[in-house]
A protein has these predicted regions:
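Nucleotide/pyrophosphate-binding catalytic subdomain
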Residues: 3-223
């Protein structure tokens, strides 16, 4: 998707879960991006493989005591750990700590009894899929010699607090994109960001509905 934004011609790419489901898929996606060297790319990425479904199980185990939420989360962690170990020969790569921190925060939430609505908890947990996948792809792209910036979409795509079906605040989002995204393209050619999620003014995470990654790509093209 090609569009013109604030004097910058850029392409928006969207990679779904199947496109980054394992190390081989990530390598293929990165090879595609490397083919556009010198062009401005905004890359929207979904959670890896069936991670969204797996994280939904974590939420249900936690909220309805259907199973052990920590065990279910560990399965998600192990899946991503295997992908990272296949992509990065050096275990000192910062991506390992960054991804681990996301899981640690989730474990902390699971340690407490539910204090919020199901939809709120859903968004805080299920959104990890996109945050983690983009960290991994961004780090691998950097390792392959393609400088890029990992953008936390929650800082620029502002929504209301209708959890699981959040509505975009177009005025705020456009202002933040102008302020934060456009200047980045003066430093690098590639921005990696998340589909499916947004943020509230209270710094909570929201999701945009089950096919939200496609929606995110369209939002950036519109803005």
């Amino acid at each position: 998707m090609l569009f013109y934004f604030s004097g910058i011609v850029m392409k928006v790419f969207k990679f779904g879960g199947a496109s980054v489901k394992d190390a081989t898929s990530v390598k293929n996606a990165v090879e595609i991006l490397k083919g556009f060297k010198g062009e401005k790319l905004l890359v929207v990425i979904s959670a890896m493989g069936k991670t969204t479904n797996a994280l939904e199980k974590v939420v249900n185990d936690y909220f309805f005591s259907k199973g052990n939420a920590h065990t279910s989360l560990k399965e998600v962690r192990d899946y991503h750990q295997q992908i990272m170990e296949e992509l990065f020969s050096e275990k000192t790569n910062p991506v390992f700590d960054k991804v681990n921190n996301f899981f640690v925060e989730a474990d902390w939430m699971l340690d407490e009894k539910p204090q919020h609505t199901y939809s709120f908890v859903y968004d805080q947990i299920v959104s990890l899929g996109e945050l983690i996948s983009t960290c991994i792809v961004s780090a691998y792209l950097e390792q392959q010699g393609c400088s890029n910036i990992w953008l936390d979409v929650r800082d620029v795509l502002m929504t209301d607090n209708t959890y699981r079906e959040a509505k975009v605040d177009w005025q705020k989002s456009e202002m933040l994109v102008q302020k934060q995204v456009v200047p980045v393209f003066n430093r690098v050619d590639v921005i990696i960001t998340q589909g499916f999620i947004g943020g509230t003014s209270e710094n909570y995470t929201t999701t945009l509905g089950r096919e939200g990654s496609d929606y995110t790509a369209a939002i950036f093209a519109y803005l």
